[in-house]
Every structure is written in structure tokens, then in C-alpha cells.
Amino acid sequence: MITDARVLQPEFIPREVQHRDAEVNYLSSVLNPLTKGERADSALLYGPSGVGKTCIAQFLVEQLRGEVVALNYQYVNCWEDHSRFQTLYRLLDGIGKTVDIHRQSTPTDVHLNRLRTADDTSYVVILDEVDQLEDKSLLYDLYRIPHITMILIANDEEDLFASLDQRLNSRLTDCERIHFDPYHENELIPILHDRVHWGLEEDVISDSHLQLIAANAGGDARVVIGILRHSARTARETGSDQITADLIEEVTPEAKSEIKQRTVDRFTPHQELLYNIITEHGEISPQDLYDAYCTRTDDPKTKRMVRN
């Protein structure tokens, strides 16, 4: 049933990207100076979850690495590495400069200086979920390092810029902005075809059943891949050689729940507290949410941070 399980994971970088030609071409043109040894402009990729932002950023950088010998690259998920120290540590790790870094005692200024004084090889930094950075002044510091090119990824452009101070806003105002719309249902089917071709045995699922998966996904590529993965696993575990419509309908809620749980599992304690309050109350106004939040923590964040 499953010939390559990696292909069924959301983190898998495909060999080609479907139905994102305009976005791929735009970002490729932004990054083109790197092929000449020059710094590229910063880029912001924004749009809802599951529309291919992360996939395309990584896909294009991997292609660049095949063309440019002297190119360093690091991907950072700022939801997981949200503190200034964590982000800088990951960036230093990307160029092999963490050998004598001590998590408890090394000042972050030392990390930043080490990035500045590293060799001048072009360094592409993808900061995913960048709005989750606790200290966004780090973006200003990275912007000022000549050999670093930043690709920022966020869900909402306005929310991101509203959270930046004036100094940083002025620096990033001219960054190249690329908007990603949700996939249409018929655009998700070629994505599924590729995953089936690369990761499953032949003839285990029909085109009509791929259409059913796409119809259940709400324009989210993560969901179609999740449903396909759960369907293939369940078919294998039950000894079936086909993925049926009944099986797809059965696993769809579980696949969607898994994606939601992955998000919840990455919450910081403050985000988890906010999530629990919203879950308890259902609909709740921003002010009531903040008031309830403040009563449950001894160290509340500002209203702006809570809103973000």
C-alpha cells in the first residue's frame, strides 16, 4: 500500500509544485540576485494555513542550493523557536557555529555578533510563523546583517505589521509581499496525484476518491495530505488493497483533528491559557478574553501580544 511514507508527511518538499506558478515565479525573481552572489530583498509570504507558503519557500531555496555553491540556508519555525535565544541558536546552528554556545550563560548579543562576523557567504533564513516571535526587534537586527536574506512567512500581513515598531516597520515596508489564496478544490487533486504516485502502490485509489478527499479539505493542502495518509495507513492496517469512499469519510475527522492538535501542542503556556478560555466560553469578546486571561496568570502579556 505505502511505498514511501515520507511523501505522506506535510513536511515533505515535493519535486515540483502544483498550481502556484505565479507565486513561484515571483519569489524566484526576488531571490535571483543570490545566483550572482548578491543579497536579495526580504520577502513576506502571507495567507491562510495550508496554501503552500512554507512548501514553496523551501522548494525554491533547495533549487537555489543546486545552482549556487556558496549558499547557506536555515528554516526556523518561530512557533517552536519563539524566543530571541532559540531563534538565534537555530540560525547559528545552520552555519555550524554553536559548538561553544551555552543555553544558560551565553548572552544573545554574543550570538548576534557571531552571525555578523561569520563568513560573508549568502545566508537565506526562512522564518515561518514569524508573527510568533516574542522579540520582533530581532528582525531589525537580522535585516542589518548584509549577507542575510530573510523570507518571512505569516498568516496575516496586517496583523504582522501592526505588531512591529516604527523603526522595523519602515525597514520592512519595501519587502516583497506575496499573497497566497486558498486552493480551489480542483487544484488540490494534482497535489494528491503526485503524493499517490510517489508514495503509494499503483491503483490503490481512484480519481473519484481523490476528488472526495479534495472536497473534504476546505482548500487546505495539509488536510488533503492528512486524509490521504490516514486512509492509506488504515487500509494497510485492515489488510485492504483499496482506499474506499467509506474509509475516506471514516478517517477525515481524525485527520482534521490531528492537524488541530499539532497546532495546540505547539502553544506556549500563555497561548494554551487563551485557548482554554475560548474553548470554555465559545464566543467571547476580545476585552472579556483579556480580562479572563489576566485573572488566571501572574504574568500577563500585553493586549497587543494577546491579540496576535
From Swiss-Prot:
It holds the Pfam family AAA_22. Transmembrane segments: none annotated. The keyword ATP-binding applies. It comes from the Archaea. One of its GO terms (biological process) is DNA replication. GO terms for molecular function: ATP binding; ATP hydrolysis activity. Keywords: ATP-binding, DNA replication, Nucleotide-binding, Plasmid. InterPro entries: AAA+_ATPase, AAA_22, Cdc6_lid, ORC1/CDC6, Orc1/Cdc6_arc, P-loop_NTPase. ATP binds at V51, G52, K53, T54, C55, Y183, R195. Disruption phenotype: Not essential for normal growth. Involved in regulation of DNA replication. Belongs to the CDC6/cdc18 family. This is ORC1-type DNA replication protein 1. It comes from Halobacterium salinarum (strain ATCC 700922 / JCM 11081 / NRC-1) (Halobacterium halobium). The gene is orc1.
